[in-house]
Design a protein with these regions (language model features):
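Conserved beta-strand segments of alpha/beta enzyme cores
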Residues: 30, 90-92, 118, 168, ...
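Short amphipathic alpha-helices in soluble, non-transmembrane regions
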Residues: 18-25, 70-82
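Non-catalytic accessory regions of SAM-dependent methyltransferases
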Residues: 1-66
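Conserved SAM/SAH cofactor-binding pocket of Class I
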Residues: 142, 146-224
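S-adenosylmethionine
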Residues: 195-324
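Short hydrophobic/aromatic beta-strand or adjacent loop that forms the aromatic wall/cage
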Residues: 3-5, 55-57, 116, 313-320
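Non-catalytic substrate-recognition/targeting regions of SAM-dependent transferases
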Residues: 73-145
């Protein structure tokens, strides 16, 4: 079978943005993200500073037998704004007889976050570089991207800092499942909760792929009043999404969700956390930019939380709180 290979180079900031845009296109068979190989490096290893600094190359494939010129033009037009704003190169199009196997990929996708986490695709060959590394194997999807969204990265940095073995944790808005996997591999027990059926399936797949099914329970549903907010991203939910009651049962809640949901659930977060002699009741929030920072922090402070830590990446921000 022959394929139309469409590719572009993009920045760290825009890699998951590209995936989100491509989710609108039917019939995309496969998405591959690799580390960018810079053709502008001289033999001495110096970069041509006049060239933009790309981080990743994204390749995706359409069956050549059913691919039309109109479909390719639609994809090119969809991605054009990223090219015009300097976030991606112009779309490149070629015909290939076979897609490359994992062993044939140049610069396979390997990305480090914090001191220990290493994000990999399911098939990327990898040998640990240091003791204590924690591999997180994540399938790149158009629904949830690569796991490199700034909010995800900030969450992982705080998770690495605060999660310890034997904690009982709620991952609210689990999405791809990457945060649940990370916490399970740090020794925690996790309830992964999302009100989107696609997210629930993606989380379950990631849990099995990373062999943490004994530590992670995946459910469709929401916490407390979150079940009354509808689909947080505006999509469809099943009727009567199960509700997890906000009673003192979690040592930590991690929520990488929209600002308005953080605000709506502030009191439920407080009720769902428990304080013990060894655990103060922790909340990690992410998924919003500095535009909403003050409103989220104010709502959580009023609900009885104390800010203890913060991580920032460009306009994105994540906070750690404890029960005051």
């Amino acid at each position: 079978m022959s394929w139309m290979e469409l590719s572009l180079d993009t920045t760290h900031e825009a890699v998951d943005w590209v995936c989100t845009l491509l989710a609108k296109i039917k019939d995309i068979d496969d998405v591959r993200i690799t580390e960018y190989a810079d053709p502008n490096l001289s033999q001495s290893g110096e970069r041509d500073v006049a060239k933009p600094s790309w981080t990743f190359t994204i390749r995706f494939y359409l069956n050549h037998q059913v691919c039309s010129r109109e479909q390719v033009e639609k994809i090119a037009n969809l991605l054009l704004p990223l090219n015009r704003t300097g976030l991606a190169t112009e779309l490149q199009i070629s015909r290939v007889n076979d897609k490359p196997t994992p062993d044939e990929e140049l610069n396979p996708f390997v990305h480090r976050i914090g001191q220990r986490f290493v994000i990999l695709t399911p098939d990327t060959p990898y040998q640990a570089k240091a003791a204590g590394e924690i591999p997180l194997r994540l399938k790149t999807t158009l629904s949830f991207g690569s796991g490199l969204h700034p909010a995800t990265m900030l969450s992982l940095q705080l998770i690495e800092r605060y999660i310890v073995p034997s904690m009982n944790i709620l991952d609210l808005g689990s999405g791809s499942g990457i945060l649940s996997i990370a916490m399970a591999k740090l020794g925690a027990t996790v309830l992964a909760l999302d009100n989107d059926r696609t997210a629930v399936q993606a989380t379950q797949d990631s849990v099995y792929r990373n062999n943490v099914e004994q530590q992670v329970t995946v459910m469709e549903g929401s916490l407390g009043g979150g079940s009354e907010l509808g689909h947080w991203m505006g999509g469809d939910t099943t009727e009567n999404v199960p509700k997890v009651e906000a009673t003192e049962r979690f040592d930590v809640i991690v929520a990488n969700i929209l600002a308005r949901v953080h605000i709506a659930l502030a009191d439920d977060f407080h009720r769902a956390l428990r304080r013990t002699d060894t655990q103060p009741g922790l909340l990690i929030t992410a998924g919003f930019t500095t535009d909403y920072e003050q409103e989220v922090v104010s709502s959580l402070t009023e609900a009885g939380f104390e800010t203890i830590d913060c991580e920032r990446l460009n306009e994105w921000v994540a906070f750690a709180y404890r029960l005051a």
